[in-house]
Amino acid sequence: DRLRSRGLGDVYKRQAVEKALSFLPSGAVVAHGGSMTLEETGMMDALRSADIEFLDRAVCKTPEDSRKIFHDALMADYYFMSTNAMTIDGELVNIDGNGNRVAALIYGPENVIILAGMNKVAKDVAEAVDRVHLTATPMNCVRLNKQTPCAVTGVCADCLSPDCICNQVVITRRSGIQGRIKVILIGEELGY
């Protein structure tokens, strides 16, 4: 409610995709991180049909292909992702396995566009980290067929499993470059 009272969270799926596409000039180089939110909103389909150079990681067939596209994504004009959680004060909390998504968030692409559902909003950083460990990570481990305790129990065990996807924890307090990170908060539950 506090976010809505500030005029946030009143964008819905169709408007979110339209808003995000409005940032992209023709021919822009665009990359993305793994995200159920981008899939559920239709953003991925929209990017695949847009007049852009799309670095689509879904086409990668080998680990070498993935490494190259992750590297090239750091030089993209625009990088699309969701966030694992965000506080009511606007801090972003992301926990990553490979680090490619948080690397792009921190540095590299000229612009970062984040689509996030209201279910990602937490009171503070501690609650946001808990949200990731108790909701996002277990569900992602199941989806990705990871052999982790949380994929079995649904609860984070703070594991150090070889399949662990909680390898980097990044809290973004603000963007060092004004306007580089754009958050589109969607008034629906999306992603994990």
Predicted region positions:
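Single conserved hydrophobic/aromatic residue that forms the stacking wall/gate
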Residues: 1-8, 12
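A glycine-rich, hydrophobic loop/mini-helix early in the fold
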Residues: 26-80
